[in-house]
Amino acid sequence: MKIISPDNDSIRYTRRVMPDGDLYFIFNEGNKATEFTADFDKVGVAKEWNATDGTLQPINATIVNNRTRLTIKLEAWESKLISIGKSNREYNIKEYGVKGNGYSETATLQRIINEAVHNGGGTIVIPAGEYLSGALFFPRGVDLRIEKNAKLISTVDPNEFPVIPTRFEGIEKRWRCAFLNFDHSDGVKVYGEGVIDGKGVEWKKIPFGNSGRPRLLCFTDCPGR
């Protein structure tokens, strides 16, 4: 947890990393009430524990730079227990405007991914059918499920695969991005019975150049659980 504003030396906290999210015990050691804004090192849905009935109640949060941002009020000597867990919401791409008509739908797919992040994460679902796309970027908190008889197919267009700072064969360098890119996504899952088709044979016809060809998948700083 990092306090953004205002500076406050009366706040203490402990964090416990759980399989389904993180728990934060936050305590005001001061003798005055305080309000502060803090970033939590997790993308997810924020809830506060109600000490009266033992339930977790949703609280307002925003996602900023791959972290969950909260504004918290604490009375003198008051403590709160905050839970931040990955959303179980699913985003079926067909329900969000993807057509699967043989044309590249990179922008629409990326918009769905970004919407999921904005809402605290979740799972992007690729249903049965064939879907064409350029490079996609999955921020923290977003999983990918490719269902049976579904195929996510790469375009063979260098313009849809920008050259970015990345790591290639253990060396930090500028290189063409992968088809599916996951960055700082702790516990991310890519699963299902469908197919990810990177069109490797077709990409071999594109000159390697100084920036290479796309990889199929790239996980950067993505520790498991």
State each model region's role.
Residues 1-88:
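Carbohydrate-binding surfaces of carbohydrate-active enzymes
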Residues 82, 88-225:
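Extracellular/periplasmic carbohydrate-active domains that bind, remodel
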